[in-house]
């Protein structure tokens, strides 16, 4: 499959926002989990449930371990939406060019009172690849601009990482809409507590909540929702898919 991204998109008349269970789109998801913690499994199942709401899905994979599953998401009939591209090579210049083209075309649709295309970008364990998260003033990483402007373009993004602290702070603590944590080390967990504590939940509370969730086994995750107020910020994703609110300790 080609690693080049075609940049032309067509207008559509559907609403550019939709909901799926707890989640409201467009959205930026961050998903953190150590190997074998169920991180990619959760993302794969989420994609299976929401994919038909999108016109295009682009998936960057850091490894080929899960390639067969993600490739299987595409419909055998190429004329049916969504168009799905699975890429194994990350090129910052290619992504930036695609994003700027998408930005221009989406804004043209919005200005013409038409609904923008629904596009989903998935970055699965590619944080270590050159130019993805690192940045400098002369040449910022495309993900910085994407994370800051996705809402205005009807664009949704999923970023997965084995480590919380490896993701830059604007994304891990500010710009995301939903943060899902399957399993992390204590250094990451302490930082999560520090960056997400509020008037109702202390950093220690957050750590204890996560430990309790994880004690129920793989498949149980903690959700931090920036789509809710501070009192309803923390949620339990159960192994059976049910999502329940966590009240202050």
Predicted regions, residues:
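Compositionally biased low-complexity segments enriched in polar/charged residues
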Residues: 2, 73, 81-83, 216
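Pre-Walker A adenine-sensing motif
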Residues: 3-23, 44
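Pre-Walker A (Motif I) flank of P-loop NTPase domains
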Residues: 23-29
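Conserved P-loop NTPase motor cores
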Residues: 29-49, 62-64, 90-202
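AAA+/P-loop NTPase substrate/partner-engagement loops
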Residues: 52-74, 95
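Short secondary-structure boundary/capping segments
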Residues: 73-77, 196
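Conserved P-loop NTPase mechanochemical-coupling segment
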Residues: 77-94
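Conserved GTP-binding G-domain of TRAFAC-class P-loop NTPases and closely related GTPase folds
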Residues: 171-249
